[in-house]
């Protein structure tokens, strides 16, 4: 078993608390019901969430459920980060969220990273260079002798028992262009900071699941493929969770999410459909 019973319970408690918090927020938010045109149109909303056409067609309880689902989906990314941390602690020496690396590098190296990202952004290369190609460019530039200190934050940091290090940026599997460029910049900075490390270092853009299917070959995001080193920098679904734990980690974690969902489904329906 990749996720031991104690960790399973910690994950369940965390997910229960997450859903409860989401429910509390949405139970407290009033939703203007559509009784008739004359009473609805003069309504005011400080949140800018009046939708006269939606409200006239869809019952308020269903609208509330829809809002809850969208909010839950937005916040779900934070649950992936915490679950990876909890699982990783069972398999590795260290696992930390929001891990900061502070380093002083030559001014020319920071500038070279930004220039490479700008080249990718403007599409000046037919294909995004590999991480290794970009790192070779960064390491070969003439240095100025002027040091600049920057802080780079990783969503998740893991130190394995052999001392090797893993850095993960855990982001949406359907990123926009800006998100891809931001992650690539961060990965290049991490690798450049760690270039003299005595232990092996790997940094990845991690996606908790693949929206197009189970296999890597089925993945279809054009932004990811165009603006990242997809072959070497990106890990998706099971390949990501296997790095965190074992080959069965992904399916075991999904089972935990499902168990929590089944246990909370009646409460969610009752509270949001009232």
Curated annotation (Swiss-Prot):
Catalytic activity annotation: Endonucleolytic cleavage of DNA to give specific double-stranded fragments with terminal 5'-phosphates
UniProt-listed GO biological process terms: DNA restriction-modification system
One MF term in the entry's GO annotations: DNA binding
Residues in the signal sequence: none
Keywords: Endonuclease, Hydrolase, Nuclease, Restriction system
Effect recorded for residue 223 to I: Greatly increased specific activity
The EC number(s) this enzyme carries: 3.1.21.4
Pfam families for this protein: RE_TdeIII
Family: Belongs to the TdeIII type II restriction endonuclease family.
Protein role: This system is more active than isoschizomeric RM.HgiBI.
Listed name of the protein: Type II restriction enzyme HgiEI
Gene name as annotated: hgiEIR
